[in-house]
């Protein structure tokens, strides 16, 4: 598979599925670490919650997918290293993206954006970015449209 095709596929898959995986882990984190009653509030506003996660997470997820697609063959063919780089890259890219948005005051004008992007809610950004980066790096070779056949990545064990 050509590098440009792999970059397009990885970027799109990460952008579409990454924020959704992040929301799943964030909801589980809120349910187990915080009060379970907050989960009822989140379920009531789930469409808005998904929209916010996609608007704040799609671009960092896409950039993480492009980064994973551009990994050298030695690193990209090994599951552990690909997941490690995907997770760390997801966190770093998300934090850089949020720092840029905070400095652009027009985009961060609403109270909801300012609350999400504030330093107090660092765990709300780091956990979904880390876990979505790791999970997407792990399953990216199994998604349709990618002709990656590497013995190291073909088994899910």
From Swiss-Prot:
Source species, domain of life: Bacteria
Periplasmic side: 33-36, 105-115
Residue spans crossing the bilayer: 12-32, 37-57, 84-104, 116-136
Keyword terms: Cell inner membrane, Cell membrane, Membrane, Transmembrane, Transmembrane helix
Any one GO CC term of the record: plasma membrane
Stretches of the chain found on the membrane's Cytoplasmic side: 1-11, 58-83, 137-157
Regions annotated as coiled coil: none
Protein name: Inner membrane protein CbrB
């Amino acid at each position: 598979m050509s590098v440009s095709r792999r970059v397009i596929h990885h970027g799109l898959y990460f952008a579409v599925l990454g924020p959704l995986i992040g929301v799943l882990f964030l909801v589980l984190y809120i349910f187990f670490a915080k009060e379970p009653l907050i989960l009822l509030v989140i379920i009531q506003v789930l469409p808005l919650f998904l929209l916010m996660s996609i608007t704040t997470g799609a671009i960092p997820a896409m950039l993480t997918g492009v980064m994973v697609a551009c990994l050298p063959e030695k690193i990209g063919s090994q599951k552990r290293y690909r997941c490690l780089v995907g997770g760390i890259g997801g966190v770093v890219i998300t934090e850089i993206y949020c720092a840029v948005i905070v400095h652009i005051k027009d985009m961060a004008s609403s109270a909801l954006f300012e609350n999400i992007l504030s330093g107090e809610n660092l765990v709300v950004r780091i956990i979904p970015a880390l876990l979505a980066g790791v999970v997407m790096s792990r399953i990216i070779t199994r998604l349709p449209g990618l002709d990656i056949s590497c013995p190291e990545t073909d088994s899910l064990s």
